[in-house]
């Protein structure tokens, strides 16, 4: 999270990680928690993270323009109880194109969800 209230900070290296620009705030909410951000095989960027306030939501945002603009595409988990937590997401896309999301579920276990990139755009999982 960034220095402002509930900000995600990000930087991208065009030099294989040898040189980095200054990090910038993304216009996405974040309650000082970890996020996952892979580049999909299509070239789009996907973020899994929590919404504003607490960790009682797990959300997916998608960027079609290398991170300049983001849109909320799916709510994976949501609970009205602020003490419920869905956290520490990890994302990867397997060779077959399926996207795998693993995260801590209610501090009781690890949940694993598998879905297609089309699901992010409103299609079937």
Per-region residue spans from a language model:
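Asp-box/BNR beta-propeller blade signature and adjacent active/binding-site loops
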Residues: 1-125
């Amino acid at each position: 999270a960034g220095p402002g209230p509930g900000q995600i900070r990000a930087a991208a290296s065009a030099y294989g990680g040898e040189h980095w620009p200054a990090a910038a705030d993304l216009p996405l909410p974040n309650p000082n928690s970890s996020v996952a951000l892979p580049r999909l095989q299509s070239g789009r960027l996907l973020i899994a993270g929590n919404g504003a306030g607490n960790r009682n939501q797990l959300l997916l945002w998608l960027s079609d323009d290398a991170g300049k603009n983001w849109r909320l595409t799916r709510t994976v988990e949501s609970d009205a109880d602020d003490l419920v937590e869905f956290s520490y997401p990890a994302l990867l896309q397997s060779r077959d194109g399926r996207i795998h999301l693993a995260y801590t579920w209610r501090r009781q276990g690890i949940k694993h969800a598998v879905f297609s990139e089309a699901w992010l755009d409103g299609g079937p999982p």
